[in-house]
A protein has these predicted regions:
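Short, hydrophobic/amphipathic alpha-helical patches that form generic packing surfaces
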Residues: 12-23, 90-94, 161-165, 219-226
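Acidic, Ser/Thr-rich peripheral helices and adjacent loops at domain boundaries
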Residues: 48-53, 190-202
Length: 255
């Protein structure tokens, strides 16, 4: 068994997958992992992320499987679960070996690895769609729009694409509290990401300073939500099924 150890990122995993083909590995005897995985008599290979190799893999995936299946693979890699790297590697290998056409990579759902990839992508995709509606932006004193989230899956980049399209002329900041990951969108310019606890400590105090208009409108919004509620029809259990408590923590109407 040959084990490729890579960092937990799209670039790291795609570089590892590129290396498996470059080294002419036997697929069934090869493992790609983001965690410390040592098996008896196995050969361990440390993978350094390579942007050029990553771009080549992305280009191949889009050409062979299409944009939709490529997005599915990326959503699967956004999962926090450690089995994602091997699942995506074996799914890609199966698709290439069987000359799978665009839009049909996930058809072989009975295959263990394809099924894993599909399940991981579905979970990440569901959370992404939830946060498109549940993320709440608030205006800071410096007029920047700010939203704090804590998703299980690493989907901030997907959300940045969505909100950059919705608010192209707004300065906004999207913060993943669980990963200390920032999505920064300057008005009228491309967005980018920053990561680190130090960055959060530098801006934390600024995110607590809301504009006068924001304070006024959030109070109006809370009042509206409480006014339209019908006490006799309250059903907390059903509400939690439709809107998980972990989303409510950062929604102004529940604060």
């Amino acid at each position: 068994m040959k084990i490729y150890h890579c960092e937990d990122s799209l670039e790291g995993i795609f570089t590892a997958i590129y290396n498996t083909y470059e080294d002419h590995c036997i697929i069934r005897d090869t493992m790609v992992t983001t965690i410390e995985e040592n098996l008896l008599f196995s050969e361990s290979v440390e993978v350094i992320p390579d942007p050029e190799k990553t771009i080549k893999v992305i280009r191949t995936l889009k050409r062979r499987f299409g944009e939709a299946d490529y997005e599915t693979l990326c959503l699967a890699l956004a999962s926090p679960k450690p089995e994602k790297a091997q699942a995506v590697y074996r799914t890609i290998a199966k698709g290439l070996a069987e000359k799978c056409t665009a839009g049909h990579l996930m058809d072989a759902i009975a295959d263990t690895y394809v099924n894993q990839t599909f399940s991981l992508a579905r979970a990440a995709g569901n959370e992404y769609h939830h946060l498109k509606g549940f993320a709440r932006f608030e205006e800071l004193e410096n007029t920047i729009l700010y939203s704090k989230i804590a998703p299980k899956n690493n989907i901030l980049t997907f959300l940045m694409v969505h909100f950059a399209d919705r608010f192209p002329m707004e300065d906004f900041l999207l913060f993943d509290a669980g990963r200390y990951l920032f999505g920064v969108h300057p008005a009228g310019r491309p967005w980018y990401t920053l990561q680190g606890k130090d960055a959060w400590e530098r801006v934390q105090s600024e995110t607590e300073k809301l504009s006068t208009a924001e304070l006024h409108y959030r109070e109006l919004f809370r009042s509206f939500c409480h006014t339209i509620a019908i006490k006799e029809r309250e059903n907390r259990e059903l509400q939690r099924n439709m809107l998980s408590l972990r989303f409510q923590e950062y929604m102004v109407e529940f604060q």
